[in-house]
Amino acid sequence: SLVGSEMCIRDRLKEAGYATGVVGKWHLGLGDKAGEQDWNAPLPTALGDLGFDYSYIMAATADRVPCVFIENGQVANYDPDAPIYVSYQQNFPGEPTGKDNPELLYNQKPSFGHDQSIVNGISRIGYMKGGGKALWKDENIADSIVTHAIDFIKENKEKPFFMYFATNDVHVPRFPHDRFRGKNPMGVRGDAIEQFDWSVGQLMKTLDEMGLTENTL
């Protein structure tokens, strides 16, 4: 888990005047309060504390709870009518799991570890309750992170910027959007790679439109 005292590339670039952003899969921790976060309030360690001016991230990965995006230290699209509770120790009463309720899963079988809370028809690592409108839909993850990444590029086109863009596409659970399903002979993994290619293509298209391609690594 990264902590604010660790020096990383984004710190050096920020010192050099770069706008810094991170979008997508994170899984590098949210500070030293792991397991103690109140997901219904600003998180004690935001990515701003770790050197990023802007962040739109998964708390960890798509196969783990909570299945919500964190934007600048707070749950994106937070739904006050569905407060979020998370545990990696035990389930919440009445909440279905992949182990006990496999009939609720969407075309995927539970596996050891990935057999706990069911969100969007997929069993995850860990247990959660609530979320409501803040819960992501796995088939829309690529569209969501691409949209926020493009917004970051456009908002910082007039100055140097550094963006860490991490997709979840080939990481389990592979759940590409319908428009990519069946596009690759390698099955769902191949379809997820098609979706990844599209994501990179959208960012490249944006750089072209902004006239930044030749000045971007």
Give the role of each language-model region.
Residues S1, S5-L217:
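Formylglycine-dependent sulfatase
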